[in-house]
């Protein structure tokens, strides 16, 4: 049975007559890296603020670590970065972590050294944060979130502004956390391709609504270049494709859609083939090219 670290049931956040989030049903399995994808303004940060207790929900339920009561206690197991967290620019990385350690009442001073080594800043020495690169600041922010060894890590847009090398470093670090510490991670981004080689499952937010949740395997299937058509007669359509179009590389889906993975430059030919045979009616025919088409 799948164990969920985080669940929401019909979670909503309303500002007067505007829903920033509406009836969101989210499930994040233990040990996964969950990619929360949505354009700016989709509700990603609002959702994260509700999960971490920085804002109050209007409706629905939040369940953390299997519990919907005493969420304040459950949230003590969460580490998070929301947008770019405040760092003390005149301090070193070590000093920043020490301030956070004291504020949180973490007794183990060794956690500072361990965290610096984990995030790759053990050699930063006396260099002030003001002189850090953006990538170094992002890693330090991650280090702050990791203090206390949280079981659930929530990162809001952590790849913003990172160069390709920085993204790769972050990706490897997060994978290491999952593998070695069994941390579950929620990571948000408005660019799906930034998460494509990192996340193991995905949720897509649009205008405050969670459109769908899919696995990496399902996403890869979605991302294969294909022609998608919908029909009210699957059997006749597939016979036409095979016998008259000589098309055999396709998949049929429960929603009466067919995805064709060959003849991708011949959409017009396929359209003509179907329209010239009155036994088949179709309502949707287009080619998917990239992640952004989803």
Describe each PLM feature range:
Residues 3-6, 13-187, 192-206, 210-212:
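ABC transporter nucleotide-binding domains
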Residues 171-261:
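ABC transporter nucleotide-binding domain
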Residues 240-244, 270-275:
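Short amphipathic alpha-helices in soluble, non-transmembrane regions
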Residues 283-290:
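Conserved small/polar residues in nucleotide/adenosyl-binding loops
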């Amino acid at each position: 049975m799948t164990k969920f670290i985080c669940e929401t049931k019909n979670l909503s956040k309303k500002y007067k007559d505007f829903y920033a989030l509406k009836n969101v049903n989210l499930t994040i399995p233990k040990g996964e890296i969950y990619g929360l994808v949505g354009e700016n303004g989709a509700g990603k940060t609002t959702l994260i603020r509700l999960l971490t207790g920085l804002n109050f929900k209007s409706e629905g339920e939040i369940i953390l670590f299997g519990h919907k009561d005493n969420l304040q206690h459950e949230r003590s197991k969460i580490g998070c970065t929301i947008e770019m967290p405040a760092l003390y620019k005149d301090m070193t990385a070590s000093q920043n972590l020490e301030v956070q350690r004291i504020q949180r009442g973490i007794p183990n001073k060794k956690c500072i050294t361990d965290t610096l080594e984990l995030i790759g800043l053990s050699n930063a020495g006396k260099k002030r944060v003001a002189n850090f690169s953006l990538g170094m600041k992002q890693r330090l922010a991650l280090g702050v979130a990791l203090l206390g060894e949280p079981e659930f890590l929530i990162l809001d847009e952590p790849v913003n502004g990172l160069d390709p090398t920085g993204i790769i470093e972050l990706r490897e670090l997060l994978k290491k956390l999952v593998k070695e510490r069994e941390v579950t991670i929620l990571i948000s981004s408005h660019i799906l391709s930034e998460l494509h080689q990192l996340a193991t499952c995905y949720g897509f937010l649009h205008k405050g609504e969670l459109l769908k949740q899919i696995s990496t395997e399902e996403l890869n299937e979605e991302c294969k270049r294909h022609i998608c058509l919908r029909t009210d007669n699957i059997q006749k359509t597939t016979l036409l494709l095979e016998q008259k179009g000589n098309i055999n590389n396709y998949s049929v889906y429960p929603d009466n859609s067919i995805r064709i993975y060959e003849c991708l430059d011949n959409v017009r030919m396929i359209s003509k083939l179907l329209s010239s045979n009155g036994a088949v009616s179709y309502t949707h025919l287009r080619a998917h090219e990239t992640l952004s088409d989803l």
